[in-house]
Amino acid sequence: MQIVELEMVPLSLRPVLQRLYDMKTTQSALREGVLFSTKRNNYYYDTGTGKVIVLDDDTSYIFRVLFDPTLSAETFLISLTKVDPNAVKNLLQTIDAERLFQRPPLLSMGKEIAAGVTDTEQKVEQIILEVTEQCNFRCKYCVYSEDFSGNRDFGNRRMPTEIAFKAIDWALENSGAKLAITFYGGEPLLNFKLMKAVIERSQAKRGNKEIVYSFTSNMSLMTREIATYLAQVPNLYIMASIDGPRTVHDAYRVYANDAPTFEDSIGGLRILADAYAGSHMPVNINAVLTPPFGFEKLEQVNAYFESLDWLPATCHVNITYPSYGTCPGLDEYYDKITGNPKYALHGMCNPLMIWQQRKAETDGLDAYKARNIYYHSIFDDLVKINNRIIVDEPTLRRGLNGCCVPGKKRLYVTATGEYK
């Protein structure tokens, strides 16, 4: 079959059809966009413009043929004869008017990254200080355990004050109007003295620069003295590591002598909450979902965090799976549940996401009742979709994802003063 045989296509739209035909001939449609579906509709996301169009049944059929690499270009033309002629005409008009399927070809890779390395005006955005390698916990899924080869093991080194000050002074001189300072460990509160010194030095030398501070803590070393000090630090954000109720938390988060940590962690978080009483509490929670991943366990963990009424209702509870290769028994558990349709989503085993989506559908998303393990995951994804780049002129828009220009976005300083 030839394009000229399709009488339902006006002459003015045949160049559009020819472009689709050529695309099908080379099976290059997959780089132009993505087909996806919800319970109510089928959609097409256009890579070049960021636009999303709703597909009726006829256009959905045409697009499925277009995107199927096992079907020929002739089959694509034949598909146009099997639907309402007006649907074909309207589809081609939409593609032409919205400038769909016109993403520019990728002719080079990494030019903007290479250029950034030689730019003498680079301004670092975040400096991460490894204030200590020490940790008083030995969480069974920790990426720094001796059983995981991807990172260093736990050490005993602490960052000296002179290294911290030198790093901070450099960052203050080589950053823009805003600088993020992050304290990292180990457990950062093991070297709270240095954290406090860095905060006070950076505040004294910041000038008009805005500084944002952050750190993640297991909360076990939190005292009223520390909490009172932290509560008066401007632009400070804290992430508390707590996995859920006692039985869930203590199953994997233990001290070096294998003793449980729940009481000390939740007690430290309560002390911090008391210090912020009557004011905004910039503290969120990070939980790790350990085996088993069943819906019953997710309900248990969710109910626990919802019950902590001494925390702000808007407290962000982030929950993730353990890093690959870190959690004992994780591979065996995945082998057991993989293939179970109860936990399958888009061809992948993902019980957490399935539960989160169902919970959002049944209970809704209420910003004033967000202290749970589904609100922020779903809401943040929706925000990303809503704030995506949408343009009329098709463009590549951005460089390679995951590629960092050294010293531009963030800089990690080890306890011994090495840059990473």
Language-model region placement:
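Conserved alpha-helical substructure of the radical SAM core
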Residues: 83-90, 94, 108-228, 233-236
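Auxiliary Fe-S-binding modules of radical SAM enzymes
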Residues: 1-49, 55-71, 78, 327-335, ...
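Short, solvent-exposed loop/turn segments at secondary-structure junctions
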Residues: 50, 134, 188, 220-221, ...
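Accessory C-terminal segments flanking Radical SAM cores
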Residues: 28-31, 36-61, 369-420
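Long, charge-rich, low-complexity alpha-helical segments
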Residues: 6, 53-128
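Short loop/turn segments at strand-loop or loop-helix junctions that form parts
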Residues: 131, 143-145, 240-245, 317-323
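A cross-domain feature marking catalytic cores of carbohydrate-active enzymes
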Residues: 185, 215-219, 240-242, 285-289, ...
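Radical SAM enzyme [4Fe-4S]-AdoMet core and its adjacent flexible, acidic
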Residues: 247, 252-266, 270-402, 412
